[in-house]
């Protein structure tokens, strides 16, 4: 880390919940550590099993569909790269935002958001399921790395600033809020992370990661849709098609009006790299045009936020709660329009919806089977947690933790081998 960046974060930001001894396996006479605390944290996330499992978890289409599918892992790598570039522009620590991008979906269950929905249905009466809260649970509890003085897992034992950078929704489950970042039994760790922070306000690094996430999946989901033949970008220049798309978008993203989205379609249709894609036919020239489009749109959206934030916050390194990320409303509308393209032409397809229904049923049936045979049906780590759980709610949470940890391949193997017994 440069001296300027090192000085902009203090010991409070770099504190870990559990103090760790110096490394002991180095050769005599060698220096044991050249990295910053946040570089070490990034390495811990990069090397953890929970991140690797994202390679077999759905982004939009399944990880085994198509020749070069995007998975939750490839998406996370893309978010990390976009966020890192933005961090450099703002003066945030690049490793801090990079690790937030890597970890931002680390709690996603099999089948992505569809799997979230199924698990939430199962445990709704005991605190619900939310991928962001599961992120925090994995990083602070479930991923094995460090034990506290009582022998309990501290997860990866990341620094306070690193954990806060992953917290897009830094509050527990609340009435009227669909998203949340912490389960009830993880609140002690959450309160340690958020000590002294403005209530319900994500730090700047988390805001950068969140926008990088929006940019990555809006642009790349459209890229995948164009390659698959499901999305034709020429609809943006068709007034009737754009109006229909804007109506769908305004219903799904109610902070914007149809007029906002029609205007966004008109602007994007006039961007030369968008028009150059035309009718995608898979040729070399078409593929180059599409890749140019994705690269330039990522730059368009990321740089607009950087410039707008600097206009408000001024020069100098920005960190933690020094500033809010400012995203121009016109740019936000363009990103929402791209999300709507994927929603309309990929996610609303009747075949896709049927696949999703089958996936949710599969998760429900696996949960029933694991519950009926627990703790014998659980992995050793989860079996011990199940045996120590004080009540049915805590025991069901352990079962949900195990299912959320599954790759899609493993979930399907367990489903095929299941022998369910009814819940009591």
UniProtKB/Swiss-Prot annotation:
Gene3D superfamilies: Hypothetical protein af1432. Residues 72-218 form the HD domain. Disulfide bonds: none annotated. One of its GO terms (molecular function) is dGTPase activity. GO terms for biological process: dGTP catabolic process. CDD domains: HDc (cd00077). It holds the Pfam family HD_assoc. InterPro entries: dGTPase, dGTPase-like, dNTPase_2, HD/PDEase_dom, HD_domain, PHydrolase_assoc_dom. Belongs to the dGTPase family. Type 2 subfamily. This is Deoxyguanosinetriphosphate triphosphohydrolase-like protein. It comes from Mycolicibacterium vanbaalenii (strain DSM 7251 / JCM 13017 / BCRC 16820 / KCTC 9966 / NRRL B-24157 / PYR-1). The lineage of its organism: Bacteria, Bacillati, Actinomycetota, Actinomycetes, Mycobacteriales.
């Amino acid at each position: 880390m440069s001296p300027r960046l090192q000085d902009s974060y203090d010991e409070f930001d770099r504190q870990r919940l559990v103090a760790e001894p110096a490394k002991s396996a180095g050769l005599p006479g060698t220096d044991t550590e050249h990295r910053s605390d946040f570089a070490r944290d990034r390495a811990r996330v990069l090397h953890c099993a929970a991140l690797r499992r994202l390679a077999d978890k759905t982004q939009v289409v399944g990880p085994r569909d198509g020749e070069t599918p995007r998975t939750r892992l490839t998406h996370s790598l893309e978010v990390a790269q976009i966020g890192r570039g933005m961090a450099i522009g703002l003066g945030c620590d690049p490793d801090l935002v990079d690790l937030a991008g890597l970890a931002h979906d680390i709690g996603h269950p099999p089948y992505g958001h569809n799997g979230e929905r199924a698990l939430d249905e199962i445990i709704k009466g005991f605190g619900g399921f939310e991928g962001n809260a599961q992120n925090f649970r994995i990083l602070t509890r479930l991923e094995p790395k460090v034990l506290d003085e009582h022998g309990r897992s501290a997860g990866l034992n990341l620094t306070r600033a690193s954990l806060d950078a992953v917290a897009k929704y830094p509050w527990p489950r609340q009435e009227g809020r669909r998203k949340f970042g912490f389960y009830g039994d993880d609140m002690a760790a959450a309160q340690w992370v958020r000590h002294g922070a403005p209530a319900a306000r994500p730090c700047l690094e988390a805001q950068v990661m969140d926008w990088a996430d929006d940019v990555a999946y809006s642009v790349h989901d459209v890229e995948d849709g164009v390659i698959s033949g499901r999305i034709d970008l020429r609809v943006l220049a068709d007034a009737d098609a754009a109006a229909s798309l804007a109506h769908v978008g305004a219903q799904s993203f109610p902070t914007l009006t149809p007029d906002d989205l029609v205007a966004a379609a008109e602007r994007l249709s006039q961007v030369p790299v968008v028009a150059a894609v035309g009718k995608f036919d898979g040729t070399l020239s078409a593929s180059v045009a599409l890749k140019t489009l994705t690269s330039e749109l990522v730059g368009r959206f990321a740089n607009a936020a950087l410039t707008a934030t600097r206009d408000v916050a001024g020069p100098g390194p920005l960190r933690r709660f020094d500033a809010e990320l400012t995203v121009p409303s016109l740019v936000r509308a363009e990103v929402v329009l791209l999300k709507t393209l994927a929603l309309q032409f990929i996610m609303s397809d009747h075949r896709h919806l049927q696949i999703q229904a089958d996936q949710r049923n599969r998760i429900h049936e696996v949960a029933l089977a694991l519950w009926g045979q627990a703790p014998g049906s659980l992995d050793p780590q989860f079996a011990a947690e199940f045996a120590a759980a004080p009540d049915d709610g805590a025991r069901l949470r352990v079962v949900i933790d195990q299912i959320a940890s599954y790759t899609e391949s493993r979930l399907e193997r367990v489903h095929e081998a299941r022998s369910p017994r009814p819940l009591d």
